[in-house]
UniProtKB/Swiss-Prot annotation:
In plants there are two FBPase isozymes: one in the cytosol and the other in the chloroplast. The gene is FBP. Coiled coil: none annotated. This is Fructose-1,6-bisphosphatase, chloroplastic. Keywords: Calvin cycle, Carbohydrate metabolism, Chloroplast, Disulfide bond, Hydrolase, Magnesium, Metal-binding, Plastid, Transit peptide.
Length: 411
């Protein structure tokens, strides 16, 4: 087919022609990399023209996959994160379900806390718990929410709560039988003032010893005793632990024994979204968190420690004091900024005030996973064997260097 007179020079390159392309005033180089090189003429190349042919890629050339660009709108929820841990073999399906039920309980409690004044959930309930403490209305409701979520999971065998006298065997359990200990609402005395509060939990390995047995004719006291024995485990046995802080935002902090992760509740989607990975507490910090209103009832060695923190020393900068009155709130700040939180024994509380099983042990498990330390002043908290459900111990927790410094004063 002959080219028309009006054909442009470039049109010669688009046609399979036997004519010479030399007719083009200024031949264009299609492949600059081949410019100046001799190209062998084979059956697909003709001296009188050019045919458009596909060129096979060089088999020796390495093709690198394009880097995946992370979208600014990509969110990883707590649920998807747990499923990934399950796929990696870090946890099993049963534990994933238990964790999801705890997250659901925390969402419900967060809503109750935010609407406490509107829903008339402030003030005391009129009852006293096993510790002799006045129960707030939200204490009772939060305990019910937590317990119901764990029961409905079908994967929990025993639950032990600050608000319950003894551990409770969950009859509805289908499989899993995990032991879950929790404080449904820590810092509830702050509710009326809308100050930070939180929930604390710990999860231990499955255990069947406390489940109801239709063939067991023993007295209820014997069954309760078996429950207590199986729940009273040292913190070293924890599989997972965490807390949820109800503050300006709702933050769910979790460890499965390999790092500490934080998830923030997105009110738009109603989901906990991963916001911090592998949190590490600073090795030291210039913040201390103690209730100094009890100073006169403390041990002399502890008084000396606090006095030295206030001394500017050669640096000219004393430690800063920060105290909220909520274990979760004070601990979360310490985890991020470093320093030390302490609730010591005193003349009024000979054994301390915080509970070992569902407050001190879970928090110590978290802080150690972040590189910190939890101590009763002399021993590692996770090594202490509980002798009763509501056992109290002194607690000093935070940056490793700060806790070890305090232990030297108390030695």
């Amino acid at each position: 087919m002959a080219a028309t007179a009006g054909a442009t020079p470039s049109s010669h390159l688009l046609l399979s022609s036997s004519r010479h392309v030399a007719a083009s005033p200024q031949p264009r180089i299609l492949f600059p990399s081949l410019s100046g090189k001799r190209v062998a003429v084979g059956k697909n190349h003709h001296a009188t023209g050019v045919r458009c042919m596909a060129v096979a890629a060089d088999a020796t050339a390495e093709t690198k996959p394009a880097a995946k660009k992370k979208s600014g709108y990509e969110l990883q929820t707590l649920t998807s994160w747990l499923l990934r841990q399950e796929m990696k073999g870090e946890i099993d399906t049963e534990l994933t379900i238990v964790m999801s039920s705890i997250a659901m309980a925390c969402k419900q409690i967060a809503s109750l806390v935010q609407r406490a004044g509107i829903s008339n959930l402030t003030g005391v309930q009129g009852a006293v718990n096993i510790q002799g403490e006045d129960q707030k209305k939200l204490d009772v409701v939060s305990n019910e929410v937590f317990s119901n979520c764990l029961r409905s999971s079908g994967r929990t065998g025993i639950i032990a709560s600050e608000e319950e006298d003894v551990p409770v065997a969950v009859e509805e359990s289908y499989s899993g039988n995990y032991v879950v200990v929790f404080d449904p609402l820590d810092g509830s005395s702050n509710i009326d003032a809308a100050v930070s509060t939180g929930s604390i939990f710990g999860i231990y390995s499955p255990n069947d010893e406390c489940l109801p047995d239709s063939d067991d004719t023993s007295a209820l006291g014997s069954e309760e005793e078996r429950c207590i024995v199986n729940v009273c485990q040292p913190g070293n046995n924890l599989l997972a632990a965490g807390y949820c802080m109800y503050s300006s935002s709702v933050i769910f902090v979790l460890t499965l024994g390999k790092g500490v992760f934080a998830f923030t509740l997105d009110p738009m989607y109603g989901e906990f979204v991963l916001t911090q990975e592998n949190i590490e507490i600073p090795k030291a910090g210039k913040i201390y968190s103690f209730n100094e209103g009890n100073y006169q009832m403390w041990d002399e060695n502890l008084k000396k420690y606090i006095d030295d923190l206030k001394d500017p020393g050669p640096s000219g900068k004393p430690y800063s004091a920060r105290y909220i009155g909520s274990l979760v709130g004070d601990f979360h700040r310490t985890l991020l900024y470093g320093g030390i939180y302490g609730y010591p024994r005193d003349a009024k509380s000979k054994n301390g005030k915080l509970r070992l099983l569902y407050e001190c042990a879970p928090m110590s498990f978290i802080v150690e996973q972040a590189g910190g330390k939890g101590s009763d002043g002399h021993h590692r908290v996770l090594d202490i064997q509980p002798t009763e459900i509501h056992q109290r111990v002194p607690l000093y927790i935070g940056s490793k260097e700060e806790v070890e410094k305090l232990e030297k004063y108390l030695a």
